Amino acid sequence: MARQALRSTLWLLPSILLCFPFCLPLSGQHVTELPGVLHCGLQSFQFAVNLSLEAESPVLTTWDSQGLPHRLKNDSDCGTWVMDSPDGFLVLEASYSGCYVTLEGSHYIMTVGVQEADVAGHVAGTRQRLLTCPLALQGKAPDTPNAKVCSPVPVKERLPCASSTISRGDCEELGCCYSSEEEGADSCYYGNTVTSHCTKEGHFSIAVSRDVTSPPLRLDSLRLGFRNITTGCDPVMKTSTFVLFQFPLTSCGTTQRITGDQAMYENELVAIRDVQAWGRSSITRDSNFRLRVSCTYSIHSIMSPVNMQVWTLPPPLPKTQPGPLSLELQIAQDKNYSSYYGTDAYPLVKFLQDPIYVEVSILHRTDPSLSLLLEQCWATPGSNPFHQPQWPILVKGCPYAGDNYQTKRIPVQKASDVFPSHHQRFSISTFSFMSAGREKQVLGGQVYLHCSASVCQPAGMPSCTVICPASRRRRKSELYFDNSTSISSKGPVILLQATKDPAVMLHKHSGTHADSPTLWVMGLSASMVITGVLVVSYLATRKQR
């Protein structure tokens, strides 16, 4: 029984250790998945993450088998290396035999995370990722290029990958395309991708197609050794479609790292983007391209490369993606929309018929093809958008025609920090709700503003444009307001009725409730007292004389 219990404990131990990073350091914190690109090498993890999307001062962290956090840094004793890139990406490499990697069955596992801090500097949450790589990667051959990579290359644009006498198997082992059908053409050639390998002579060989990016890559913008540019590192061969770099392991900014009985050589291939300035704006038509390659050799001989790995720049986040629509309704302080009232400024105080400048905008989106459509806007005396009574402001995107003081739509001007199609602006004249009875009394004197809106694509097209007035609008079936989202003002607007009569203002705001006869008697009495005092003073003066 004791042996059986011991076996059960040993069997459960990896799972218990795996649970520590999730349970101990993160109790009471909000945990979400950390996005990034993982590559499984023969000896290590390689994980690239864009920390510019995380907190202001992100810290890459891991947890040991006891659940204790450790800040990741360059530490050869623990087998971790952290490298920054100018584009904001951080590349972590962690050896499978390092301090923070656990062997779980047939996989190596490691937990990494980025801790996020609040305004006070306290840890508010963690974005976390469990890295897993299979155990058996030795002897893995390069992927054979598929037809999509090989077929589009014209015969006259082919860049030879090896001699014409090479066999199909040896050609594909280099990661190259093979074809013996075209007479006089190179049978082994590079495909429309990045092809790299380590030679027995101790050289890197890297071929890049212009079609690996969209828009196509400017091949003359590629540079080797981004951190240490040296001479003699130009391409050895170049066509209008391909460029080929071949250089020794000890040149062109290559870095070397010794781990055990193996030496790893690394270099980078970077496209320098052409940025043109005009006024206060800068533009570029070049793609973002960054490539890191490594060759691993035995320190006893370079005749047999152990491993070749390539890390490309992680793809950018999509500009268009499904998700909740976040809107904001703000009231501007002036007609130029130069500033807005904050939450602490509510309730706002306005006089009847004064303009209120309203803006509804999309939050957390940077896609210029999105267009914000306002469907309905209305006012209620309470914060509940379904509260009664309601007064329409916009109906199907157009000012409500039944109002004597019609709402005015205000165009959004282009600005460096504003997508015009993400904003809708209008001004309204303030009003008060009246009771439904014959006396028509003012109800409460405050209103809340509400709008329902949706997003349309592409911006600027007739199908995404509201035309007013109704007589000029397209047929009803041509414009849809599906899946609309509602938004309300941050607080109420208190409406006052202005008056220019000081007597009325005095009567309204005085603390007495006396009626007119009482005021008349009090005034007469005061006059008689003042007259009596004056007469007595006059008689006393004459008597002294």
From Swiss-Prot:
Gene3D superfamilies on file: Spasmolytic Protein, domain 1, Zona pellucida, ZP-C domain, Zona pellucida, ZP-N domain
Residue numbers on the Extracellular membrane side: 29-518
Protein localization: Cell membrane
Pfam families in the record: Trefoil, Zona_pellucida, ZP-N, ZP1_ZP4_Ig-like
Main location (coarse class): membrane
Glycosylation sites: N50, N74, N228, T312, N336, N483
Membrane topology: Single-pass type I membrane protein
PROSITE patterns cross-referenced by the UniProt entry: P_TREFOIL_1 (PS00025), P_TREFOIL_2 (PS51448), ZP_1 (PS00682), ZP_2 (PS51034)
Annotated S-S bridges: C377-C451
Chain's role: Component of the zona pellucida, an extracellular matrix surrounding oocytes which mediates sperm binding, induction of the acrosome reaction and prevents post-fertilization polyspermy. The zona pellucida is composed of 3 to 4 glycoproteins, ZP1, ZP2, ZP3, and ZP4. ZP4 may act as a sperm receptor.
Protein's UniProt name: Zona pellucida sperm-binding protein 4
Organism: Rattus norvegicus
Gene that encodes it: Zp4
